[in-house]
């Protein structure tokens, strides 16, 4: 008689967590940060059709890493949730906290009840109305439904530690848009590079958008083309190109003739 296969609940949760983390680690990184006029999204995304950054509602934005089909389902569900709440009550009742809580409940349920968890990590950002003293809000929601109210910036994706370190060293309050883009792009260039080296992250591989608090209704807008080229700092020159060629210490002299 064969014994039935048994795995403890702890082992099952551990395996699901490992699966989700590996899937997220394969994704390219995203940086979300607050700046003087609202919230900035900067994502590594060479695709012009499949977006990792999107609008959710009037003052809400969305960013995600992981499996595209899974976070796209979450994005669409969030838009429907926000539209229904705004239609049933009032547009001002649609807040980042309520939407982040809805995402957390959905991901938590999927993680515990479904055979496979979602391999995603998402960020919901919110800015206040024009003239409101309310500070921008950033909510990070992970694959198991955990939710964290982040301060200043969020880093998601594969190689997060060097990017987060660069952000902590460079970030400061009251950044303007150009400075915020420069800090985020330079931080992304640290991901996956060796010690003291920077990757080449050019404009064509970036997806950039902002939640602009000064806009009267829909705060979300994308930045692309020439406008983005003016904001992105130049890529660092390769060491081989910048270093001068070494010169010989002594000049070679012809050998003396033999007698």
Curated annotation (Swiss-Prot):
It comes from the Bacteria. The formation of the proteasomal ATPase ARC-20S proteasome complex, likely via the docking of the C-termini of ARC into the intersubunit pockets in the alpha-rings, may trigger opening of the gate for substrate entry. Interconversion between the open-gate and close-gate conformations leads to a dynamic regulation of the 20S proteasome proteolysis activity. It holds the Pfam family Proteasome. PROSITE patterns: PROTEASOME_ALPHA_2. Pathway: Protein degradation; proteasomal Pup-dependent pathway. Keywords: Cytoplasm, Proteasome. Residues 233-259 are annotated as: Disordered. One of its GO terms (molecular function) is threonine-type endopeptidase activity. CDD domains: Ntn_hydrolase. It is found in: Cytoplasm. GO terms for cellular component: cytoplasm; proteasome core complex, alpha-subunit complex. GO terms for biological process: modification-dependent protein catabolic process; proteasomal protein catabolic process. Residues 244-259 have a biased composition (Basic and acidic residues). Residues 233-243 have a biased composition (Low complexity). The 20S proteasome core is composed of 14 alpha and 14 beta subunits that assemble into four stacked heptameric rings, resulting in a barrel-shaped structure. The two inner rings, each composed of seven catalytic beta subunits, are sandwiched by two outer rings, each composed of seven alpha subunits. The catalytic chamber with the active sites is on the inside of the barrel. Has a gated structure, the ends of the cylinder being occluded by the N-termini of the alpha-subunits. Is capped by the proteasome-associated ATPase, ARC. Belongs to the peptidase T1A family. NCBIfam families: 20S_bact_alpha. Component of the proteasome core, a large protease complex with broad specificity involved in protein degradation. PANTHER family: PROTEASOME SUBUNIT ALPHA/BETA (PTHR11599). This is Proteasome subunit alpha. It comes from Rhodococcus opacus (strain B4).
């Amino acid at each position: 008689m064969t014994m039935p296969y048994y795995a403890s609940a702890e082992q099952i949760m551990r395996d699901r967590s490992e699966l989700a983390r590996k899937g997220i680690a394969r994704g390219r990184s995203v940086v979300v940060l607050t700046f003087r006029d609202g919230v900035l999204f900067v994502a590594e995304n060479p695709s012009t059709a499949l977006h990792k950054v999107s609008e959710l509602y009037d003052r809400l934005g969305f960013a995600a890493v992981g499996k595209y089909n899974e976070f796209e389902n979450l994005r669409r569900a969030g838009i429907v949730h926000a539209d229904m709440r705004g239609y049933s009550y009032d547009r001002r009742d649609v807040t980042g906290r309520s939407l982040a809580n809805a995402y957390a409940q959905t991901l938590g349920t999927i993680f515990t009840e479904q055979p496979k968890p979602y391999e995603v990590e998402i960020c919901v950002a919110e800015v206040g109305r024009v003239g409101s003293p309310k500070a921008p809000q950033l909510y990070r929601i992970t694959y198991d439904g955990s939710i964290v109210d982040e301060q200043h910036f969020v880093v998601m994706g594969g190689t997060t530690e060097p990017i987060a370190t660069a952000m902590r060293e460079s970030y400061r309050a009251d950044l303007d848009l150009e400075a915020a883009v420069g800090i985020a792009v330079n931080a992304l260039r640290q991901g996956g590079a060796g010690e003291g080296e920077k990757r080449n992250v050019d404009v064509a591989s970036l997806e950039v958008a902002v939640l602009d608090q000064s806009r009267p209704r829909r705060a979300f807008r994308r930045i692309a083309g020439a406008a983005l080229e003016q904001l992105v700092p130049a890529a660092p020159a390769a060491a081989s190109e910048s270093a001068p060629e070494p010169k010989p210490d002594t000049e070679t002299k012809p050998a003396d003739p033999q007698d």
